[in-house]
């Protein structure tokens, strides 16, 4: 059954431009190279929730867990951590509608 990797974070203060360049030029293409299918991304503009919420898909939870153990993910994730704070992630079975 398809599964989602749901990630949430806030952009680190004073790193907005570098963050944006990284997301566009490295993070999203890197996720695709690993094999993730792009889902949706949301930006929170009001309230006490994570500023960014993104999900990507793979065919199963097992596939996601294997991808998260790979060197490509570790490198990509490590670089993301240079630009974000309050990062969280979880793996869930995909269902229709909004999941967080």
List each model region and its residues.
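Active-site-flanking beta-strand signature of metal-NTP-handling nucleotidyl enzymes
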Residues: 3-10, 54-55
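Short acidic/glycine-enriched loop/turn segments that link adjacent beta-strands
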Residues: 46-50
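An amphipathic, aromatic/His-enriched active-site/gating alpha helix that lines ligand/cofactor pockets
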Residues: 26-28, 32-38, 57-92
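Short, solvent-exposed loop/turn elements at beta->coil junctions and helix N-caps
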Residues: 41-44
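Short, low-order "capping/linker" segments at domain edges
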Residues: 92-100
